[in-house]
Amino acid sequence: MERGRQGVVPVMTRALTDLQTEWDAWHSAREAELATPHGWLSLRSLQWLTPEPSAAEGVPGLWSATPDGVVITATPADDLVVRSVREPRRVDGTVTLHPVDGKPGTLVEHGDLVVEVVRRTDSHALRLRDPAAATRTAFTGVPAFPVDERWVLEAAFQPYVEPRRIAVGAVVEGLSHFPTAVGDVTFRVDGQEQRLVALAGPDGALSLHFRDATSGVSTYPGGRILKVEAPGPDGELTLDFNRVVNLPCAFTEFATCPLPPAGNTLTVAVEAGEQLPA
């Protein structure tokens, strides 16, 4: 194993052309996902609801937050359609929605617009998704550091005896998120051991949400995320920091992203992965 120019120990020597080709395909898919008609770039507003029924920006009907959930009052002429796993239903009268805290919201369609009804901590809000939002129509791509095999690293996963529900802050003051921490991931950079709390992902995968010395300089201040496949039987992992991504809040002020877990700040500059959007 060779020592990298900055002291990073790569997992193996890989042909940079292969690494670049794989990354190019991944990055193109990532940008395409961001730019879908109702993706993160389409957010146009974030409106916090009160118990008083009131109009919402851009869509008809009256909306309010109650202890039971979000109440919508509308007529068929208002053309509000609630998406459902079974079949869409048009609002005719009063409907109560029950979004889950910290999860993707319930979607209500109005023509080309989509209202995402979300719950965050003890509050409810509406996120308006508009394909014509300036953040989407002016999108030209996500800047990133040059691909470098030095940032493909060996790591080890040490699972906790039991998963832990932890509290982290949010980019919106006063909100909290409650992800599940499942263990620690350790690796070495510049000869120094680095440790990150790993959050649960789907099907045993891990999510590493961290800050580093680039945060607030060339990358988003609130940190970035690396998604990792499920560890091997002995806890072995490969971390490809070239695939570190921004959270949605790096692209829009209307997201409510979590902040990294306490202690998830690396002592090095991870000059790999996505940079701060222009």
What are these regions (language model features)?
Residues 184-232, 242:
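Acidic/His-leaning functional-site neighborhoods
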Residues 109-181, 188:
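Surface-exposed beta-loop interaction hotspot
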Residues 31-60:
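N-terminal beta-hairpin/loop module of FHA
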Residues 60-68, 113-119, 194-198:
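Broad, structure-driven detector of short, well-ordered beta-strand segments within folded domains
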Residues 5-7, 215, 236-238, 242-278:
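Extended, aromatic/histidine-rich regions of cofactor-dependent oxidoreductases associated
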Residues 1-21, 28, 278:
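Actinobacteria-biased recognition of intrinsically disordered, low-complexity terminal regions
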Residues 78-124, 131:
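Protease-labile, long low-complexity intrinsically disordered regions enriched in Pro/Ser/Thr
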Residues 49-100:
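Forkhead-associated
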